[in-house]
Amino acid sequence: MFRERIIVQDSLVADESGSAFRIRLPWYRALPLSTIEELSVTVDGTAFDPARLRIAVNDGEWALAEAQLRTDDVWFVLDDATVRLPGLVLDAGAHEVQATLSMRIPYLPVAGKPLSMAETDQKRMDVKELTA
């Protein structure tokens, strides 16, 4: 729905432990984290293992599989989530980041099942050093 808004422009940060960037919910209403079906990330043409990425929303941070079990943690429309890529050390300069986010919309049934939507966004961003 709002695919061009998924990746927050100029949010790519990195240090010796890995990289991170922020994403936004591509829907017009808040959704529980358990509605995330897929989150895949590619940096400079190389896919990052989804089992290793972490997502931080509100005051919590989880592996993707853990986040998909969080029925009481809600991702609000105006709040960015941080996608952490542990071990992905990036050099200074510009990098091509692509994210595909697939969400299940539980209150919109289609053919007896919840609506499923997948959106992909790609941005070229300069990496910034992660500060404490």
UniProtKB/Swiss-Prot annotation:
It comes from Microbacterium sp. InterPro entries: CGDB (IPR045959). Optimum temperature is around 40 degrees Celsius. Carbon-carbon bond-cleaving enzyme which participates in a carminate degradation pathway. Cleaves the C-C bond in 3'-dehydrocarminate to form kermesate. Also shows weak activity with other C-glycosides, such as 3''-dehydropuerarin (3''-oxo-puerarin), 3''-dehydroisoorientin (3''-oxo-homoorientin) and 3'-dehydromangiferin (3'-oxo-mangiferin). Belongs to the C-glycoside deglycosidase beta subunit family. This is 3'-dehydrocarminate deglycosidase beta subunit. The keyword Acetylation does not apply. Pfam families: CGDB (PF19906). The lineage of its organism: Bacteria, Bacillati, Actinomycetota, Actinomycetes, Micrococcales. Optimum pH is 7.5. Activity is strongly reduced in the presence of chelating agents. Heterodimer composed of an alpha subunit (CarB) and a beta subunit (CarC). Its cofactor is Mg(2+). The keyword Magnesium applies. It catalyses: 3'-dehydrocarminate + H(+) = kermesate + 1,5-anhydro-D-erythro-hex-1-en-3-ulose. Keywords: Carbohydrate metabolism, Lyase, Magnesium. Its EC number is 4.1.99.28. One of its GO terms (molecular function) is lyase activity.
